[in-house]
Curated annotation (Swiss-Prot):
This is Uncharacterized HTH-type transcriptional regulator MJ1545. The keyword tRNA-binding does not apply. It comes from Methanocaldococcus jannaschii (strain ATCC 43067 / DSM 2661 / JAL-1 / JCM 10045 / NBRC 100440). InterPro entries: Cro/C1-type_HTH, Lambda_DNA-bd_dom_sf, Tscrpt_reg_HTH_MJ1545_prd. The lineage of its organism: Archaea, Methanobacteriati, Methanobacteriota, Methanomada group, Methanococci. Residues 32-86 form the HTH cro/C1-type domain. GO terms for molecular function: DNA binding. Residues 43-62 bind DNA. It holds the Pfam family HTH_3. PROSITE patterns: HTH_CROC1. Keywords: DNA-binding, Transcription, Transcription regulation. It comes from the Archaea. The keyword Iron does not apply.
Length: 241
């Protein structure tokens, strides 16, 4: 019984956060679509659960219908959560980890989810990056996390590492103050969860450790370098909508 109430409380916490994010968003429709995409749920699947036609979901998301009230937003969000629970609750668990993040997460310098995904090619241009491994320019990126690699190694536990992925693993995981890239790629390799792309800041492409390159190839993760200083890098990343 105790576990049940703990689970319910945490679900309410997640739901309240998402509802608040949608209500306060400048564009409600885009916010609805963003969260549906983060849960990796198709319009037709959500419409079936809510017992409405897919066109109704589409109309709200693209703004053809007037902004939905709080009750409709609540039903929309609770449906996302229930569908995710039926699939194992992986997204809910990720959200909970972020909302309950520990004090040791000082290593995270910036974390953000994008309203609309951008391609790997667009992302590389934004950060003045060079691709060391991989060439899939159409790879979608839904967010980013910038982490101080030294603090991460010294302060973060294995459980803390999962906080780096925000609401979704479909993101760029960016390590600053990198010397060879070996430690970040080893950390990614041993983790069950994998980012969409890894960025190493402050290192030349030809200076990346051979093992780091090999691990990126094994996990099929694009590996990028950038020479932007940390402040400018975060500034550009935070300008992505």
């Amino acid at each position: 019984m105790t576990f049940y109430f703990y689970f319910v409380i945490n679900m309410e916490k997640v739901a309240i956060y998402i509802i608040g994010d949608i209500v306060l968003a400048e564009n409600t429709g885009k916010a609805l679509k963003k969260w549906r995409n983060l849960f990796n749920i198709q319009q037709i699947e959500l419409a079936k659960y809510l017992n409405v036609s897919p066109s109704v979901i589409s109309d709200y998301e693209v703004g053809r219908r007037k902004n939905p009230g709080v009750n409709i937003i609540k039903k929309y969000v609770l449906a996302l959560i229930e569908i995710d629970k039926e699939k194992g609750g992986q997204t809910i668990k990720a959200l909970k980890r972020i909302l309950d993040k520990s004090p040791s997460m000082k290593a995270i310098l910036s974390i953000k989810e994008y309203e609309n995904p951008i391609t790997l090619n667009e992302f590389v241009n934004i950060i003045d990056g060079e691709i060391a491994v991989g060439d899939n320019s159409d790879t979608p990126i839904y967010g980013h996390t910038v982490v101080d690699s030294i603090k991460a190694i010294l302060e973060m536990t294995g459980d803390d590492f999962y906080h780096l992925y925000g609401w979704t693993t479909e993101r760029a995981l960016i390590f600053t103050n990198v010397s060879t890239g070996r430690s970040p790629m080893v950390a990614v390799r041993v983790s069950i969860m994998k980012p969409r792309v890894v960025v190493l800041q402050g290192i030349n492409k030809d200076k990346i450790d051979s093992l780091a390159l090999k691990l990126a190839e094994i996990d099929n993760i694009p590996l990028i370098t950038t020479h932007l200083d940390t402040k400018e890098l975060i500034k550009r990343l935070n300008e992505i909508k």
